[in-house]
């Protein structure tokens, strides 16, 4: 399945919630009709079955993290093999992706921009260039911007935006040096309550 390249707002309207796919710190304004489905007049949303609700939750989380269907399923399989709660393991794996860590540290205004920084070889972990967005960052890894990329205006703009967002407690960032430490994997209480990972587990358990 190809990566979606269309309007980001359309995806948020499809899921009925802000997926944080656009830069900025404010949630999508109500003028954007987030509660309406895509289309000029906003198609009426049908009442979903249990399966439909589970599927929509999976699609929502997949789109938040910018992961393709096959990748997402593989993350679920890995999460199920690990000890502990499968749903929480899944979220921890998604949060541990390098593109997500770069975004969380404030080096990219969106996860898509962070993914681009990674693919353009602007990111080092720890001290060597890594250009694989799905690379799993380990506790105590230092993630930094390459010297030649530090002057990029988009990185500076992203860091300014990040100052207005709540800072993740599992990360330690030195904005001046443009580097950060992945102190630990996030716990479920650290992450958004708007995600219902139990629905995803139910979907894949069938």
From Swiss-Prot:
SUPFAM superfamilies: Alpha-L RNA-binding motif (SSF55174). Keywords: Ribonucleoprotein, Ribosomal protein, RNA-binding, rRNA-binding. One of its GO terms (molecular function) is rRNA binding. Transmembrane segments: none annotated. Part of the 30S ribosomal subunit. Contacts protein S5. The interaction surface between S4 and S5 is involved in control of translational fidelity. One of the primary rRNA binding proteins, it binds directly to 16S rRNA where it nucleates assembly of the body of the 30S subunit. This is Small ribosomal subunit protein uS4. It comes from Shigella flexneri. The lineage of its organism: Bacteria, Pseudomonadati, Pseudomonadota, Gammaproteobacteria, Enterobacterales. The gene is rpsD.
């Amino acid at each position: 399945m190809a990566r979606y390249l269309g309007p980001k707002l359309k995806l948020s309207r499809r899921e009925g919630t802000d997926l944080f796919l656009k830069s900025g710190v404010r949630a999508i304004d109500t003028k954007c009709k987030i509660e309406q489905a895509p289309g000029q007049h906003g198609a009426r949303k049908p009442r979903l079955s249990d399966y439909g609700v589970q599927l929509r939750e999976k699609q929502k989380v997949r789109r938040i993290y910018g992961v393709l269907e096959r990748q997402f399923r593989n993350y679920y399989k890995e999460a199920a093999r690990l000890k502990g709660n499968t749903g929480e393991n899944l979220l921890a794996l998604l949060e541990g992706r390098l593109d997500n860590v770069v975004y969380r540290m404030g080096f990219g205004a969106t996860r898509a921009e962070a993914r681009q920084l990674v693919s353009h070889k602007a990111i080092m972990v720890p001290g060597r260039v890594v250009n694989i967005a799905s690379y799993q960052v380990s506790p105590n890894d230092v993630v930094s911007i390459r010297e030649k990329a530090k002057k990029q205006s988009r990185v500076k703009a992203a860091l300014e935006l990040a100052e207005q967002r709540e800072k993740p407690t599992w990360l330690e960032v030195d904005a001046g040096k443009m580097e950060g430490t992945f102190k630990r994997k996030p716990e479920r209480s650290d992450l958004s309550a708007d995600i219902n990972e139990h629905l995803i587990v139910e979907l894949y358990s069938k």
